[in-house]
Amino acid sequence: MAQTAWKFAQTGANWTNSNNIAADDDAYATVSLGAGAYSSPLIAKNFGFTTSDVPNGATIDGIEFRVRWRRLYGYAVGVHYASMRLSWGGSDGDSKAAQVTAISNSETSFVLGGVSDKWNVSVLSTADGDDEVRSAEFGLFFRIYNADAKYSLEVGIDSVECRVSYTAPATTTTTTTTTTTTTTTTTTTTTTTTTTTTTT
């Protein structure tokens, strides 16, 4: 199994300053939500994977997303949900939901998925799986539920990264052997000289 490097999403949508997710630089994509409310989904996509990262014919083994975030306002109680975005739009596969008992007011990070987790997305198990992760539309839907029944919540996401685990395609090596035969012919020429003597 091989792994790509972590790569930042270059495109974000639906939150305030959504494209701030493209670097770990303390510039945040932000969302505010009332008590007991869901946020709109942050769409993180366009990770820039190429055939240099995931070769043609590779088998996708797992997908991971790493999110850096912090609480900007409100109390720490919340639940975050995530699902995978596919190239034809929308979301698909397992929803990754996790209870967050303390969204820190200092930046922290967490990882969704794993090296053998394909999020129950069937296309990743087909021959088109490598094309899918290289698509600019491939990515993550991420939203938050504010579990506090009284106070609003504001959250900032600094960056979203993706890493792909894969098995490289089998390679076929063809060896050509050329044999050269050299034949040497030796010709021997024998010359006979006859001398005749006449007596008178």
Language model regions located:
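Extracellular mucin-like PTS domains
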Residues: 171-200
